[in-house]
Amino acid sequence: MLRREARLRREYLYRKAREEAQRSVQEKKERVKRALEENQLIPTELRREALALQGSLEFDDAGGEGVTSHVDDEYRWAGVEDPKVMITTSRDPSSRLKMFAKELKLVFPGAQRMNRGRHEVGALVRACKANGVTDLLVVHEHRGTPVGLIVSHLPFGPTAYFTLCNVVMRHDIPDLGTMSEAKPHLITHGFSSRLGKRVSDILRYLFPVPKDDSHRVITFANQDDYISFRHHVYKKTDHRNVELTEVGPRFELKLYMIRLGTLEQEATADVEWRWHPYTNTARKRVFLSAE
C-alpha cells in the first residue's frame, strides 16, 4: 500500500513538472506572437530564443486548449461522485471552536466531524485516505476566535490555507431555528483570474451537485481578494418575487497559500502560490480577479 501511494505520488509530481515546463514555453510563445502581431519590440529576456519560438509557432493551433492537466486529474470525479468531507480542529480546541466546527459540518452536505484529540496530522490523513475521504478541513483558533481554515484535497492535493475573519456563528444569534441540510446551489462571484478559478474550484468541489428544487443557496463572493461566505434559504412569495433569509454562519476568507500536496507533506510539497504581504505593491495588487 505504501509503495503504491509513493508510486502514484511520483507519477503525479512528474506529470505536474512536465505540464509546468510546457506551460512556461507556451507563455513565451504567446508573448513573442503578441509582439510580432502588434509590431512591438520583443521582450529583452526572450530575444535569444525568439527565433526558435517563432519557428515552433507555425505548428501550434487552438486544439491544445482542452488537453487535461494535473488540475483536472485532481478533481476528475467532481460531479460524478459526491464529495466526502471530514472536518476537524486544532489540538485542545475551545468550546467556541467546537461550535464552529459543528456549524461547518452542517454547511457541507454529508460531512463528518472528528474530534482531534492527540492525533497527529499524518495519522489523520492516512485514516481519511483509507476511508475514501475526498477533502479534509482543519479549523484553527486564537483565544476562542476561529482565525484559520485549511482545505486539503485527497489523495494528492492541493492544500489551500485561508485566514478567517469577521466570523459570526449561528450560536451567537438567538432564536435562529434549524438549518436546512439540502444540497445547496452555489454562487461564485469575482474569480476571474487563473488563480481565482483555481480557488473557486477548490471551494465549489466541496459541495455535491444540487437538485433543481433545492431552496438553499451558498455564496462565495470575492472582493479585493477577500472571499465573503454567505448562506441563505429562499422561498417564493408569488410568481415574481423571492424572499431571501440568511441562516448563517458568515465569515470572510483570505487566501495566503496553496501547496501542491496534502496536509502532512507541508515540509516537502511545492508551493503553487503564496501571498507576500510585505512587498511594496502588496496593497495595490489583487490576485483572485483579473481587474
UniProtKB/Swiss-Prot annotation:
Cellular component GO terms, alphabetical: Mpp10 complex; nucleolus; preribosome; small-subunit processome
PROSITE patterns in the record: BRIX
GO MF term list: rRNA primary transcript binding; snoRNA binding
Pfam families: Brix
Keywords associated with the record: Nucleus, Ribonucleoprotein, Ribosome biogenesis, rRNA processing
Subunit annotation: Part of the small subunit (SSU) processome, composed of more than 70 proteins and the RNA chaperone small nucleolar RNA (snoRNA) U3. Component of a heterotrimeric complex containing IMP3, IMP4 and MPHOSPH10. Interacts with MPHOSPH10.
Protein name from the UniProt record: U3 small nucleolar ribonucleoprotein protein IMP4
Organism: Rattus norvegicus (Rat)
